[in-house]
Amino acid sequence: MKNSGGNVNTFIGFNAGFENRVGESNTFIGFDAGSENRSGSRNIYLGTSAGTGIVHGTKNVFLGYQTGYNASRSGSANVFLGYQAGYDELGSNKLYIQNDSTAIPLIYGDFATNQVGIDTKSIPTGYHFAVAGKIAVEEVLIGLESSWPDYVFNVDYDLPTIREVETFIAQNGHLKDIPTAEEVQEHGILQGEMDAKLLKKIEELTLYVIELNERIQTLEEAVNSETTE
């Protein structure tokens, strides 16, 4: 033990906290746990070789065999749970929940950006959650920032004519305001926004059906009138 000024530390296990100089309020339990820590404080390392390699990091919580092993010498505020979780991680403010040393854990998080990934570390900017693969849910509530298209039923709504719709489809191969297959494949869709766009088309279609029904009724009345004469 090379402690020269560190206080309120608990080191249990051969070589645990061996290099500590001035680090304080650390709890290292297990063979070689936190053995290279010198100035890092307020860390909890539980498990054989947990936190080995970290020298100055603070506020880390590691639980499991070789958690945080060979991670950044100054990595701080990391939470690693599971066998070899966070192995070789060079950053700070990270969450790893995993049972091996893979670089892409089952659950990954970044406390600095409030992001969480399942089987992925690639979380797009502006999003808090990402999943690599399919998900099954029983219910999803989507909040919309854009307006819901009830305005289609306003008397001043400029409803395109059927001929205009036909012309647009002939020229572009898709409905107006609806992304193309290529755009969806490249960028994906925002579910709430797409639901609103599809509802708009359904409401427009409803207006066309109402108009068509009125024309049919007019024709039927004309036919019936001629028949009775």
Where are these regions (language model features)?
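C-terminal intramolecular chaperone/autoprocessing and neck/assembly modules of extracellular spikes
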Residues: 109-195, 215-229
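Glycine- and small/polar-enriched repetitive beta-structure motifs of secreted/surface proteins
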Residues: 1-126
